[in-house]
C-alpha cells in the first residue's frame, strides 16, 4: 500500500548499511509471483473461493432474523416476544461476533489461517443446529436458550471475518498483481451481502411448504437449521486450502511486538476502526429491522409474504452495489471508493428522512430510495472496509488489527441496535435516516484524514517494511524471513562439509535473503 506516513518512517529509521538484519524487497522477482503452475493457480483459486463463501452465513444470520422477528411476534405474542426480548436475541449474535472476531484474529496470526477457518466452520454448524433445536419448559425459557445459541452462532460468524478475509486476500495476492481488491470483494462481501436476500428467499420457500401461518414454529426452526448447510458445503475445500508464501515469510510465531506495531500503524487502525463503527451503526440495525421499517409503510403489517417480498426486492437492489465497489476499488482506490459509498448515506438518508411522511405513502418509491442508500453503502464501506483492514498492516499483526477493526464495527452494531427502537419511538421513524446521513458525513471525515489512498501493491512489500522497522527499533525476535535465512545457512554448512567453498556460497545465500527471498 502507498502510505507516506509509513514509508517516511521507514526511510528515516532504517539504515541498511549499519544493521545486518535489514532485508530488501525484490520488486522484479515478486512481479512474477503469478507465473506459477496450473496446479498452484488452482490451489489459490480454491482457497480464495472457499475462504470467502461461508461469509454468506453472516448475511443469512442477519437476514433470517429480520423475517423471524415478525414470526416470533405472531406465534408467541408481544408479551413473550417483546421489543426487549427481540433486542436481546438480536444482540446475542452481535456479542458473539465480537468475541469471535477478536480472539480468532489473534489466533489467526499465531496459528495457521487454515486451522482457524476450520474451527470457525465447526462452530457455525453446531451453533445453527442448536438454534433450530432451542427448547424450554416455558416460552421465555426457550427464548433464553435461543439467545445463548445465537451467541454461539455469532462466535462462529465472528471467527469467519478475520480468518476468511485474510486467507482470501493473501491467496489473491499470489494470484494477481492488479485486481486483488475486486477479487476480494466478490468472494467475501458478495456472499455477505447476498446472505440477506437469500435468507428471505429461503423464508418464502419454507413459508410456502409449511402452509403459511399455520405452522410458524416449523418455519423458524427450519430456517435456522438450513443455516448449517452454507459453511458445511465448503468444509472439504477449506480442508484442502493452501498456506501462502506471504503468510509463511511474514508471520511471527511468538512474542509479537504489539506496542511497536501499534506505534507503526496507529493512524491506519484509527481509520479502519472509526469508519467500521459508523458503517455498522447504520447498516446492522437496518438489516435486522428492515421488515419493521417496511411493514410500517405498507397497509397490512401482518402480511408476511408481502413484507418478505418487499424485503427481498430491497436486498437484491442493495446487492447491486457490491460489483460497483469491486470495479471502483482497483481504479480509483480504496479510500475514494469508501468516501463515495458514505456519500450515499448523506444523500439518500436526508432525502428519506426529510420527506418521510410523503414517501411512506408511496411504498415503491420509498423502497427504491431505501435500496439506493443500502446499495451505495455496499459499494463503499460494505466492500472496502474488509479490503482496507486486511491490507492495512503487515502479515504478523494483520489478524489482530483486522479483528480490532471488525470488533469496533460490531460494537457500533450493538449500539445501533440498542438505539434503533428508542429513536423510532421518541424521535420518529424519519430520524433513523437522518442519523444515517450524519454517520455518513462522519465516515467521510474519518476516511479523509486517517485512511491511506492505495491501489494495488504486494502485501510482502509491507511485510519487509514492517520487519525493517522492528529491527531498527531493537527488536530481536524472528519473522518468517529470518527463519528462511537460518535454514539457508544450515544448508550452506552442510555443503561446506561436503567440500564446497563456504565463503562463496555464504555470500550468495546472504544476497538471496536480502533480495530474492524477500
UniProtKB/Swiss-Prot annotation:
InterPro entries: MFS_dom, MFS_sugar_transport-like, MFS_trans_sf, Sugar_transporter_CS
The species this protein was found in: Saccharomyces cerevisiae (strain ATCC 204508 / S288c) (Baker's yeast)
Major localisation: membrane
Catalytic reaction list: sn-glycerol 3-phosphocholine(out) = sn-glycerol 3-phosphocholine(in); sn-glycero-3-phospho-1D-myo-inositol(out) = sn-glycero-3-phospho-1D-myo-inositol(in)
Description of what induces expression: Both inositol and phosphate regulate GIT1 transcription and expression is positively regulated by the transcription factor PHO4.
Stretches of the chain found on the membrane's Cytoplasmic side: 1-44, 113-114, 160-184, 238-268, 328-335, 382-399, 452-518
Alphabetized UniProt keyword annotations: Cell membrane, Glycoprotein, Membrane, Repeat, Transmembrane, Transmembrane helix, Transport
Domain of life, per lineage: Eukaryota
Pfam families, A to Z: Sugar_tr (PF00083)
Similarity section: Belongs to the major facilitator superfamily. Sugar transporter (TC 2.A.1.1) family.
Protein name per Swiss-Prot or TrEMBL: Glycerophosphoinositol transporter 1
Membrane topology of the entry: Multi-pass membrane protein
Coiled coil: none
